[in-house]
Amino acid sequence: MLSRLQKEILTDFPAPPQTEVEICHVDPALSEYLAPAFYITAPIDDISHNRIYINDAKNDTDIYYFTTLAHEGYPGHLYQTICTSSYGAPEVLSLLNYPGYTEGWATYTEMQSFYYAGLDPDLASLLQHNQAATLSLYATADIGIHYFGWEKEKNAAFWSEYGVDDTATVKRITDLILEEPGNYLKYYVGYLKFRQMREQLALENKSFSVSAFHEAILRTGPSPFSVLEETVRDQLK
């Protein structure tokens, strides 16, 4: 699947540098406590060795597995890390944390990957929009609970509006949101910022190139969106 992604993304993304990728599987003893998948960021002095861990207990369909590898690998975290490094980004960036950029980019590319899976275009669009809608619900509940102070009843009523009435399911979702306030916003809001930036710059530039847009983002590297948009706009002129 990674090999397919590496080939398919070349229509929309610049070619990545050569690197080694090891796919590892989470030990069953830890599967209950770890994310569905995660990328171990390569050290700055050895960017050529990369690892992606897959939690088999939380992957149940081929398309889920495919888009997860896109999020963590190509053109997601791994790809962004090695490309930004190959473009000569200052090493000090590794000390800074811009989760809206890193997780927003990975989510943005995950959404793109539905169209690289060989699915019927209408089905790919449906699955992509369903994934985006699901993330939007989690992000809205995150804001509701941690900013507006939703009580249990208000939170349950929110999920019920969207057909989620099972008490155990609502509790599981709520527990995830309570564990890390604001966590879902870096994924969903970050994703929206990249989409909005792409749409806006495409309107401004008649010769807009998606691949050049992505390259400008990667060359800039993790940064605040206010800085990123200005820098990308300058690079596309």
Regions found by a protein language model. Give the residues of each.
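Long, His/Glu/Asp-enriched segments that create or flank divalent metal/ion-associated functional microenvironments
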Residues: M1-K237
